[in-house]
Amino acid sequence: MNISYNWLKEYVNFDLTPDETAAALTSIGLETGGVEEVQTIKGGLEGLVIGEVLTCEEHPNSDHLHITTVNLGDGEPVQIVCGAPNVAAGQKVVVATLGTKLYDGDECFTIKKSKIRGVESTGMICAEDEIGIGTDHAGIIVLPAEAVPGTLAKDYYNIKSDYVLEVDITPNRADACSHYGVARDLYAYLIQNGKQATLQRPSVDGFKVENHDLDIEVVVENSEACPHYAGVTVKGVTVKESPEWLQNKLRLIGVRPINNVVDITNYIVHAFGQPLHCFDAGKIKGNEVIVKTLPEGTPFVTLDEVERKLSERDLMICNKEEAMCIAGVFGGLDSGSTEATTDVFIESAYFHPTWVRKTARRHGLNTDASFRFERGIDPNGVIYCLKLAALMVKELAGGTISSEIKDVCVAVPQDFMVELSYEKVNSLIGKVIPVETIKSIVTSLEMKIMNETVDGLTLAVPPYRVDVQRDCDVIEDILRIYGYNNVEIPTTLNSSLTTKGEHDKSNKLQNLVAEQLVGCGFNEILNNSLTRAAYYDGLENYSSNHLVMLLNPLSADLNCMRQTLLFGGLESIAHNANRKNADLKFFEFGNCYYFDADKKNPEKVLATYSEDYHLGLWVTGKKVANSWAHPDENSSVYELKAYVENILKRLGLDLHNLVVGNLTDDIFATALSVHTKGGKRLASFGVVTKKLLKAFDIDNEVYYADLNWKELMKAIRSVKISYKEISKFPAVKRDLALLLDKNVQFAEIEKIAYDTEKKLLKEVELFDVYEGKNIEAGKKSYAVSFLLQDETQTLNDKMIDKIMSKLVKNLEDKLNAKLR
């Protein structure tokens, strides 16, 4: 945000240089990126002088050029070739001398001696647009006869210079989005540093209603979105160019002057942070302003001549017949004041930040008004700024104040009450701050001391400080004004020590699994814990009712905490796929957050919130890069399943003691889940639905696995690793071809096998699945291998046949299996 050095001095008196002011602001948290000397006209008209055309003759080699001699007031006249049709002898003109830099937007060029059609030219006679004082290019500037040759153009045009401070306002500092807001903080800095300073703003005591010739009523139908709305009329105004001082003020901070009425509103928003709007009162049909919402899809044409479809959640400023303005965001095409306007209705309001922010995002608009409203303006400044605007309109545009202030306020803004402990101040800052210093700082920041004890203060924080509502916020303010550099680095460091525990074990295992995944070709990703609530619309397993929503999000794309890692990974896949990198394996460790309204407890606010640590895996695209050694093969859900099983094995879990079953989940087209026998879900994995992939513009199949790291850590607490000697006796393998119903899973066969022979059965492997020719409908064939081994003896055929017969019988009885 651009802050004018001279403008700042109108509100607080100080003797710091521009660079010292920038350093002071940076030290108190208003980081100032740079200081730039500026003029009301770019370049300050340096090198331009007033000249008198002595002679003007036609160019011998051109039908439109003229050869002139010009008196610049300091020596011999100069010869200048000029192409303007209106140049003539005897004129007083503006001349750019050799070496002068002229600007065209961000580009500039230097005036040099040159030959034009064979005739030497040592300068340039200028038009309005060439030096930045206007837009006319029809001919050169012709000055009044009393203009004196040799006068510097910057003196003739009374060019003003200033210094602009580029202040980077953080999102929480809505109160500093104006010159007066910055002046408040600078005032506190000056007081803390022993300077004599006063903070002042223009008086509005002169505001007086002169007649009631133009009463316009105000009706607020949606007080949630608009807690405070006020307006007043000024009758008999003349809309014209603003006086030079006002134009200069705006130009110096990069704002283009428009007319006196609009410039007044722009002046006030940059001076005090209160957005205003001046309606042409003659266009307010029915002499009534109504603040309300309109039906979904209502068309509305804004000032930029774009027709927008309104949402039923867009707050609108309307008259009796039609909408005039998107509240707090953008005016309508016919809502503003023009040269034909004679009466104005000035609006000043406090719109709810959330409503303004969502409307601005919906329509892709970012205006000076929405920038401030969505962060939270000073609710106590509504009437002050309205009165100031009315007085300025009366002064600069004429007219009379022709109505009482129509003030609709449903909620009087209250101060934030904060209990401040001296002990906590000193503890958080790391230094004992004198009590008198603390009191001086908080009062210089316009906080009122409501009560004082030996232990601390009760403070009333003004409502414009939306970022200061807790004691730690006040302490932060105390520290920044006291000065970070005034807190010495301690010579000793105190720290509490703890023995290694579960957290350290979890970290080691996390690193172990991460190394395993990297070895399998995965890349680790790290996504924002904040995500878009719209991703959860229509989901049952991850209902939007259970989202942890942000009260004051900066963006609709980051307005809630994630319930699942899935969507962050899909964003990463989409980002890579759009850059021709579609063969991907990702993993991410991160927290997921959950809100449960049923657990609401006034005494335990956090009882409704929970968070769990998860591991997410994403696989998509080709299994391996194409080469002569590897055929073109896509990744599959079975590949992902193998990765999940390997992780569980690496953590020491016995897969035979886990329960695998089908999972119905609206993020998966098909999926399985892995549970402990006690019913705790350890993992789920499957094929992501086409609907979700389409929302991210992903064409390839994506396979996703979610592992609950917290439950995994609980499960491995009971895992005991035992070592045994490698058997000296050979293992025996037997294969069976089983005909089963199509819906029977291999996991069921595996479970029955291990339940049948607990001692000698070591492995069960599926090596072929067949459906089709010679297999009846609704059936499939599993080819399964069984590995048997005894650590004490060599197995003979009789022992093996007995085990296999028992196994076949159990499969026939429980799964209706038949041998092929």
UniProtKB/Swiss-Prot annotation:
Signal peptide: none annotated. SMART domains: B3_4 (SM00873), B5 (SM00874), FDX-ACB (SM00896). Mg(2+) binds at D467, D473, E476, D477. Residues 727-820 form the FDX-ACB domain. Residues 42-154 form the tRNA-binding domain. Belongs to the phenylalanyl-tRNA synthetase beta subunit family. Type 1 subfamily. This is Phenylalanine--tRNA ligase beta subunit. Binds 2 magnesium ions per tetramer. Its EC number is 6.1.1.20. GO terms for biological process: phenylalanyl-tRNA aminoacylation. Transmembrane segments: none annotated. GO terms for cellular component: phenylalanine-tRNA ligase complex. The keyword ATP-binding applies. One of its GO terms (molecular function) is phenylalanine-tRNA ligase activity. Its cofactor is Mg(2+). Keywords: Aminoacyl-tRNA synthetase, ATP-binding, Cytoplasm, Ligase, Magnesium, Metal-binding, Nucleotide-binding, Protein biosynthesis, RNA-binding, tRNA-binding. It comes from the Bacteria. The keyword Transferase does not apply. Residues 413-489 form the B5 domain. It is found in: Cytoplasm. Its main location: cytoplasm. It comes from Bacteroides thetaiotaomicron (strain ATCC 29148 / DSM 2079 / JCM 5827 / CCUG 10774 / NCTC 10582 / VPI-5482 / E50). It catalyses: tRNA(Phe) + L-phenylalanine + ATP = L-phenylalanyl-tRNA(Phe) + AMP + diphosphate + H(+).
